[in-house]
Amino acid sequence: MSAKRRKVSSGNGAIKEASIQIQKPKTKPQPVTAPVEPSAVPNSEAESETIDDASGEESEEPAPKTFQDLGIVDSLCDACKELGWKKPTPIQQESIPLALQDRDIIGLAETGSGKTGAFALPILQALLDKPQPLFALVLAPTRELAAQIAQSFEALGSLISLRCALILGGLDMVQQAIALGKKPHVVVATPGRLLDHLEKTKGFSLRNLRYLVMDEADRLLDMDFGPILDKILKFLPRERRTFLFSATMSSKVESLQRACLRDPLKVSISSSKYQTVSTLVQNYVFIPHTHKDTYLIYLCNEFAGQTIIIFTRTVIETQRIAILLRTLGMGAIPLHGGLSQSARLGALNKFRAGSRDILVATDVAARGLDIPNVDCVLNLDLPGDSKTYVHRVGRTARAGRSGHAISFVTQYDLELWLRIEAALGTKLTEYSLEKDDVMVFRPRVEEAQRIAKTEIKALMDDRGKKGSVLKGGKGRKRGPPGSSRDHMDAEEG
């Protein structure tokens, strides 16, 4: 049941373990770049050819306009239509033809550019040609991103009987071992839990793997997964195709490229480290710190009926704002690292499904998550750096859609805001509003603040003795359903 927010008043073949006859496209897809002659192959695997979307020099042919033009078979094109993918994004246009040529790929593109489709479609098409279990492995840095990728694979593979296993930390390992024992076609995993299964789960092997994908590779390495990735690579066959996708090309990513890719082609869509998409409208509001909540409620009221992500800096502030909004009749749900894994996935699913139209989040959701149709991002607390700002506002205006991002700047945030503007290379405009209109909400906001304060205190008192994340403790590493971490989200259902 959808809980809409009210304004505050004042080809259908199935994958079988045998050969499959697939209807090939009538027109052979044109390669984006000419095949590399043996004499032109780089001597070192560290080198790679680069295709820069900004140059427009890699092909004289017009850019493909449909997935069929890229060489994708009809059954997968139909799945794209079901998902509302009307035409390929730039990263998909550049990457898919190369992947269909059986090449390793490094894809560099900003968040929200359609990277999942860029690697999922070629993998599924190859699976249709030569079906086998444990065909592809996708590694992601966070549980939420892994869950999102698995959902995309399942949606794209819905017409071809795809089997996909999601392997995450924080969930039952025995149930995951059972799922792996059923020989899925695609495994989507976080690195730590996958390594646990490779080392401990009897009968589980990836020695016949055909495809490896590392999504958000820069973040995988920023989160110190490097040693775990090294161990995982030892369990994989060297004869495979590898796709590495990243927002940036750091020295760590280059080292990873040398370790696991063979003669890769580099596809670069991003032209600036701090680039945002042209369909994103960015503004700020300069406000007194003491009235942040009132301005927040005013803006949520202005965007009533639209989907909003509100970013805060701390777990406790995320909880407080969610309570504040719910008290005022708005469908808000929190997302932060203090929640159990099931509660975090539940929050994302409720927001995606539309049963909640406001997601209040820490930066756990600021990168990599594909949440479709987010209309507005509100930076209630400014991020600590420009890179995080770009990742936050990238939650809206995705895949060619329009979006709006508004940042709250108080008297204490001026220096930080100027640094963000400098990194963006532009002076953003102030969002137009009338202070008198905002202050009409103040009495109701103050009452809601008192209620939120009382609820937060009760929650902290209830959890404090158990190492509450809200009180700054580490919390418990594990716990059965119904334990303290799940209690934090009890009123979200």
UniProtKB/Swiss-Prot annotation:
A motif (DEAD box) lies at residues 215-218. GO terms for molecular function: ATP binding; ATP hydrolysis activity; RNA binding; RNA helicase activity. It is found in: Nucleus. A motif (Q motif) lies at residues 65-93. Gene3D superfamilies: P-loop containing nucleotide triphosphate hydrolases (3.40.50.300). ATP binds at A109, E110, T111, G112, S113, G114, K115, T116. Its EC number is 3.6.4.13. Residues 1-67, 462-493 are annotated as: Disordered. GO terms for cellular component: cytosol; nucleus. Keywords: ATP-binding, Helicase, Hydrolase, Nucleotide-binding, Nucleus, Ribosome biogenesis, RNA-binding, rRNA processing. SUPFAM superfamilies: P-loop containing nucleoside triphosphate hydrolases. InterPro entries: DDX47/Rrp3_DEADc, DEAD/DEAH_box_helicase_dom, DEAD_box_RNA_helicase, Helicase_ATP-bd, Helicase_C-like, P-loop_NTPase, RNA-helicase_DEAD-box_CS, RNA_helicase_DEAD_Q_motif. Residues 291-439 form the Helicase C-terminal domain. Its main location: nucleus. ATP-dependent rRNA helicase required for pre-ribosomal RNA processing. Involved in the maturation of the 35S-pre-rRNA and to its cleavage to mature 18S rRNA. Interacts with the SSU processome. This is ATP-dependent rRNA helicase RRP3. The gene is RRP3.
